[in-house]
């Protein structure tokens, strides 16, 4: 994923808050939605942007999808920024 796409995903405060939540533990989409005052559809879109940027990954368990941080991408971004 291009750094530009990743930085675009990080630019949104709601997406950064989702990453903060996922820093603590993996969560289902429903659990993530409970922490915000926006619609489930809006959170779903934010999750899609984060996933496309490689910042999170998902895993289906039965009828639920759980999201977790992809720390490898975050570490790569930090290293790239240090060397600018």
Where are these regions (language model features)?
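Conserved small/polar residues in nucleotide/adenosyl-binding loops
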Residues: 82-84
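Residues in the helix-turn-helix
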Residues: 42
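Alpha-helical residues within the helix-turn-helix
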Residues: 34, 45, 51-52
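Active-site phosphate/pyrophosphate-handling residues
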Residues: 17, 47-48
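N-terminal helix-turn-helix DNA-binding core of bacterial DNA-binding proteins
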Residues: 2-39, 61-73
């Amino acid at each position: 994923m291009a750094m530009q796409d990743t930085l675009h995903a990080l630019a949104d405060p709601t997406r950064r808050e989702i990453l903060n939540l996922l820093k603590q533990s993996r969560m289902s989409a429903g659990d993530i939605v409970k922490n915000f005052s926006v619609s489930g559809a809006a959170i779903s879109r934010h999750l899609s942007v984060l996933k496309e940027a490689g910042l999170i990954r998902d895993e289906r368990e039965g009828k639920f999808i759980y999201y977790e941080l992809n720390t490898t991408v975050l570490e790569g971004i930090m290293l790239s920024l240090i060397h600018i």
